[in-house]
A protein has these predicted regions:
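Alpha-helical interaction segments
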Residues: 14-15, 58-59, 111, 134, ...
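Activation targets extended, charge/polar-rich intrinsically disordered C-terminal tails
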Residues: 2-24, 35-43, 48, 96-124
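Aromatic- and glycine-rich peptidoglycan recognition patches
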Residues: 2-17, 23-29, 148, 152-198
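N-terminal capping segments
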Residues: 25-104
C-alpha cells in the first residue's frame, strides 16, 4: 500500500514538472499554434536578427533593443516617471543608450516624448527619409502618421528587413515592448524613416 502511494506521488511529481516545462516552453518560444494568437497572448521572443555587415552604431541599436525587450520595463521608466504614451520615449532611450542621443527641438533635452516632435527632429537634422522609395535598414526609426490604420501616431525601430518584410520593435505596443511586422509595400500611414546612422 505504501509503495502504491509513493508511486502515485512520484507520477504526480513527474506530471507537474512536465506541465511546467510545457508552459515555460510555450511562453518562451513561438509554436505553430501561438502564431495565430493575438499579440498580447503570443510568446515574447525577440525577432531573429542578422547583424552581419551592419555599421557598429546600428549593431548597438539592435543590442539595446534586445536588452530592453528582455527587460520589458514599464513606460514610466522611459518617460522619466511621466504617465504618457511612451513609444517616442522608448525610441529616445534606445538611441541615447546606443551612443546616438537625440536633442529635443523644443526643450533641448535628450528625450523626445512625442512622435510629432521626433519627426520634427529628424526633419531638421536632415535624417528623415520618405516611406517610398527608401528601403529601411535595421536601426532606422519608423514614424507613423495619425492616419495609420492600426498604430495611429506611433514610432518603433526596424530590426530586420527580409525581402518585402520589415520587422520592428517598439514600446507602448501590445504587451509593453513587442515586435511588429509589416510589408515594405504597405506604406500608407508611414510618414517616413528617421535614419540615426548615415
Amino acid at each position: 500500500m505504501r509503495r502504491i502511494g509513493l508511486s502515485v506521488a512520484a507520477a504526480l511529481a513527474v506530471l507537474v514538472v512536465l506541465a511546467g516545462g510545457v508552459v515555460w516552453w510555450s511562453t518562451a518560444h513561438e509554436t505553430p499554434l501561438s502564431r495565430h494568437l493575438p499579440a498580447e497572448l503570443k510568446p515574447r521572443t525577440f525577432p531573429t536578427v542578422s547583424t552581419a555587415g551592419l555599421d557598429p552604431s546600428r549593431i548597438r541599436i539592435i543590442e539595446n533593443l534586445r536588452r530592453e525587450f528582455d527587460a520589458n520595463r514599464p513606460g514610466t521608466y522611459y518617460s522619466e516617471g511621466v504617465e504618457e504614451p511612451w513609444c517616442a520615449d522608448f525610441v529616445s532611450t534606445v538611441l541615447r543608450d546606443s551612443g546616438l542621443p537625440l536633442r529635443n527641438p523644443n526643450s533641448g533635452t535628450w528625450r523626445i516624448p512625442g512622435v510629432y516632435t521626433l519627426t520634427e527632429y529628424f526633419q531638421k537634422a536632415g535624417k528623415l527619409e520618405p516611406a517610398t522609395p527608401y528601403r529601411p535598414q535595421p536601426g532606422d526609426v519608423v514614424l507613423y502618421a495619425p492616419e495609420h490604420p492600426q498604430l495611429r501616431q506611433h514610432t518603433n525601430i526596424v530590426v530586420s528587413v527580409d525581402g518585402d518584410t520589415v520587422t520592428t520593435v517598439g514600446g507602448n505596443q501590445a504587451g509593453g515592448i513587442s515586435a511588429l511586422t509589416y510589408r515594405v509595400a504597405d506604406t500608407f500611414g508611414i510618414v517616413g524613416y528617421g535614419v540615426p546612422v548615415r
